[in-house]
């Protein structure tokens, strides 16, 4: 951090007061960010706590198997949506960057990525955008399949012709149907141990 410069005594008294006040405010703000704010603080566990958490997760199965299950669920949802809406098609996103991101999964709150991750199903891209009525049909199918995972808390940020979304979360899972220029389905799972950790 850059040290505050001394205030010249030649400044009028009121200017010195203002300058000192501003330095005090900025030091508090900057100091708070650099000294107190640590995004990893909530994720830190002692060695014993980490071992206990890992042991408690072993019976959930592996990250890799969970990702396969979620991708199978994404396929079921996409097939159901296509069957329910005439002319609708779908495919898994073939963008290599998206595919790599999906394979890598998301970070867990308390364990590092070399131990556990949150699986992400292969991203679904629908062949056509949904009308308002068709979006309701698709969202209802997502709702039904998400409930099987214990995800029942629904939300939506926007519902207009240019942008629609439906999100349902719970039990560590998130299902998101999103439509802007095209319609997509993304599913993220709870935290699972990597297979290599289970094998130890």
List each language-model region with its residue ranges.
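C-terminal motif of bacterial Sec signal peptides marking the signal peptidase cleavage site
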Residues: 29-32
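Compositionally biased P/S/T/G-rich terminal and signal peptide-adjacent segments
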Residues: 46-55, 69-120
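Second-shell loop/turn segments in exported
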Residues: 57-68, 124-133
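Extracellularly exposed regions in secreted/surface proteins, prominently low-complexity, repeat-rich
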Residues: 162-200
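Ser/Thr-rich, low-complexity intrinsically disordered terminal regions
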Residues: 89-105, 154-174
